[in-house]
């Protein structure tokens, strides 16, 4: 009798334990259930050609495309408040001894990177793909290359992207119904080499009175997660568009756009087809990219060195570290994206006070 009772209870007990032990995301409710909009051919062929030309011209200059850590220091903005007290002097050799600190541009201080929140989460969890490897390898995996630009008038082809009907339709499907006036403000080029990924993250949030022009981005992300400043939160929409001309990246190539709209162990995934795009409010929807060509080991990049990707012509690219060429790639080896963003406002009148947050401090 006891044996039969034990057998009868075994199956439901096993099912209960399995449900309790199943891996799941732990995302606050206010960061779930937001809209993501995907469209093939979101970028027209002519715009794609011009954007690829602009990208190569940028990557051919003396700066090239720095890693994302360096790009925040070199090509984005310098916040009024660079740190919250963690700054330490650089070592005699110019390095930062603490593994989580980086040099603050050309200054004599080491500070937390702008997105230490993203890096630390990835190192501790391995991201959606639960990667486990040495610290230096993980840092190299998420050190993609790019530039951040805020002056849209310098790039007519980007202005045309924002004005086009496809962006307008996608953006207005993401912005709240009560905030359908769009305010374009930023675009980025982001390139990944084989073995790299884009770690799970929120995009730099904007609040009335608190933006990346005033405070470190990791602090702004903390404000979003806390849900204590919602009355000052500025909704936005970003489009991740794909500029590589290779066929859609399949399961073997990886590099898909990943996002969480529910607390599930598995994120939703979208193929990175050429000239397609995904529109989402990345400042309140956690998103990432799968590892691009996961069978390839990403090049080891020392955080204390000047690492950048350069276009050298004839569809060839050089990865350099302190001027030394570490690797040569073909354009077909790279995952290429443009990310362009607009804020969502309720009326044209709301656009007036925005100027305070677009002035570099």
Q: Each predicted region: which residue ranges?
A:
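Short, solvent-exposed loop/turn segments at secondary-structure junctions
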Residues: 42, 48-50, 70, 189, ...
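N-terminal auxiliary "cap/dimerization" subdomain that precedes the catalytic jelly-roll/cupin core
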Residues: 2-167, 332-337, 343-361
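Extracellular structured ligand-interaction cores
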Residues: 40-42, 184-186, 195-197, 234-240, ...
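Catalytic core of Fe(II)/2-oxoglutarate
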Residues: 246-361
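Signature of the catalytic double-stranded beta-helix
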Residues: 118-232
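A short catalytic or substrate-binding loop motif that flags glycine-/basic-rich loops and adjacent residues
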Residues: 180-181, 231-235, 249, 330-332
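Charged, glycine/proline-rich intrinsically disordered loops and linkers
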Residues: 90-140, 201, 207-225, 296-325
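Active-site region of the double-stranded beta-helix
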Residues: 225-235, 239, 243-245
